[in-house]
Amino acid sequence: MDVEIKFDPSKIFSELKKTNAQYVIALKLKSDIIKVKESESDMLLSLFVDYPKVSLSPSNVYQVSVNKDDTNVKIMTSLSSQLNDESIGSWCDFDCKLILPNNAEELVAAYNQLNKTDYELLPQNSYQLGGEIHYNVGDSQMEGMISIRREKLTVKYYLLPLQLIGTGNNNVMYDDVVHYMVISRSYQNPIIDQSAADPTVILANDGYFYLYATGGNVPVYRSKDLVEWKYIGSAFTAQTRPSWEPMKGRAIWAPEIRYIKDKYVLYYSWAVWGKQDECHIGVATADSPEGPFVDHGCLINGKEIGVRNSIDQFYVEEDGKKYMFWGSFNGIYATELTDDGLAVKRNTDGTPVLLKKVCGAKFEATNIYKRGGYFYLFASIGSCCDGLNSTYRVVVGRSKNLLGPYVDDKGGDMLQNNFKLVVNKNNTWVGPGHNSILIKDDEGTEWMIYHSYKADAVADGRVVLLDRLRWDENGWPYIKGLEPSNSGLIPVFK
């Protein structure tokens, strides 16, 4: 014969919430008719309560990028409930909600100490926690919502501790583990998720940044903040693209954009893969950064000037003079340009007034940046275009003089192929290199835009990355960890 024992689940759940104890019931079997053996009369009944319990999603830390005026973040909650060892949904209607713990400031301080971070508590006027999260009978998951206002945030990392509580039903338990949201105005790499190799960037007179890249008729992108880019067309069309001889097999590589004497000047490499004696440098101009660009033909003829593989040009001004640096794995060279930047400055006999070798044969993709009394010559080394086998990376040397000598941090001359590493590959990014001219934001931070393959999608080509350039105590530049990032705080433009 079965004996029925009835429980009040509400009272049991209430006690479990207070004590989290394991309960037992002591039973004794008695009879007025028969004699019960003493050894069989006592029973200890363990009470296993498989109560429904609601928790936040498994992740204890959420990463949130706030790049829109209003960002809505969904937080998943889930209910754990079983019947006869099988998972079931809720067997009652109930409500719960997200709250900010009363000791939020202390939690942020403890988190920072444990994780060696410097996050601030998210300002209360910058977010709104959604209303009650309602579960109907049968539900096993429901979403909560947090709305964050970008205008209330500065460019830094914030932390928001969260807990889940019930709002009236005593038959449901709630996981009181604190979860955290790391919130920032940040970007995700790649900033251009399609092939746009050898990027060059300029801040134009209209307040927009324009990016030009290798490929077709030179794709052009536009951005207000270096993060969100929109494709707007190409610098050339099929009718206006360069047509100077030799034409056969020519492609436009490694564009370099400048603003000279009220004109947008686009230098480009007129090249054939694998034919170093047939690579030259051309120039085109436009009144607008969007084009249309009018081609002016050859600026540097590799054969005529005596530099094989004449590509990867870089324009720089110093002391009222205009210079062009260029070269690829046959030495980096410098020459002086005319005042309009459209021709090589020459002696009366037709020879260049300047032709100087400044780096050895290990380098290409020159980029020069002046800072703190030094000229920093960035370059790329290794193989650029072999997918997962690419060994491309960015290196640097520096000099007190624009024309060198450029040396590494140990004094080794770049003419002898010495260098200091700036950024290399990792498990996510392969072949990072050919950086654009460095851009300084309104807080004085320098930013580097460059290309790389995605290790898990090399077929996408060389996509575009953005990273903050850091400087060590001796004044040498580097990307954090000497590797591309997946994300970071956005540049500050007010």
Predicted regions, residues:
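Short boundary segments that mark the start of a structured unit
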Residues: 1-187
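Carbohydrate-active catalytic/glycan-binding domains of CAZyme proteins
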Residues: 184-494
